Design a protein with these regions (language model features):
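A short beta-loop-alpha structural element at the N-terminal edge
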Residues: 4-18
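Residue-level recognition of the GNAT/N-acetyltransferase active site
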Residues: 11, 99, 132
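Active-site rim helix/loop that mediates acceptor-substrate recognition in acyltransferases
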Residues: 27-55, 62-83
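Short hydrophobic/aromatic beta-strand element in the GNAT-like acyltransferase core
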Residues: 46-50, 62, 95, 128, ...
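Conserved acyl-donor/pantetheine-binding loop and adjacent beta-alpha core of acyl/acetyltransferases
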Residues: 58-96, 103, 153-158
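Conserved catalytic-core motifs of GNAT/GCN5-like acyltransferases
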Residues: 67-70, 128-130, 140, 145-161
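Conserved acetyl-CoA-binding loop-helix of GNAT-fold acetyltransferases
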Residues: 98, 104-117
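Conserved GNAT acetyl-CoA-binding A-motif
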Residues: 112, 118-132
Length: 166
């Protein structure tokens, strides 16, 4: 599987692909807005990890976040890129997106693993994310710890806050 993909930071000309993938992977109440996605890619492309299908040259999925010294996930991270401190000791993961045709092949796990290794090498201490109840077990298999119900009410949903310690 790994040999079929190139893993790297996102390129500015891939913003439209990222927006389209986000809208496929998340319902409208949870998806990142095109404006916020464009701002994230413009400001911190290095905090994206994309998986490019070598056979098509197109994005198959990606993981993105914002760096901060904060230790608690809050909804404003989704919408306010100015909260990002590129030198922050932690990363708040904002979205793990894998197109449906690439699911079930271990790509999500590979993205989380490679992202965590890269950010650990960059001096990050912890990765945080929020997820719905039905995704908790998947993220536990990826090595994250469930911290319980999050303060987040993003999209009108109840979320679990999870952490991966470096």
């Amino acid at each position: 599987m790994k040999d079929n993909f190139e893993f790297r930071s996102i390129n500015p000309d891939e913003v439209e692909q990222a927006i389209a993938i986000e809208q496929i992977c998340f319902p409208p109440n949870e998806a990142c807005s095109p404006k916020a996605m464009t701002e994230r890619i413009a400001k911190v492309p290095q905090l994206f990890l994309v998986a490019v299908d070598k056979s098509t040259g197109k994005l198959a999925g990606f993981l993105n976040g914002v760096a901060t010294d904060e230790e608690k996930f809050r909804d404003e991270f989704f919408t306010d890129i100015d909260l990002c401190d590129v030198n922050g000791k932690n990363v708040m993961l904002l979205g793990l997106d894998v197109l449906p045709e690439y699911r079930g092949q271990g790509l999500a796990r590979e993205l989380v693993y490679r992202y965590s290794q890269r950010e650990k090498a960059n001096g990050r201490k912890k990765l945080f994310l929020t997820c719905l109840e039905q995704k908790v077990e998947m993220y536990k298999k990826f090595g994250l710890q469930d911290l319980g119900i999050a303060d987040s009410t993003w999209g009108g949903e109840e979320w679990h806050e999870m952490v991966l310690k470096g």
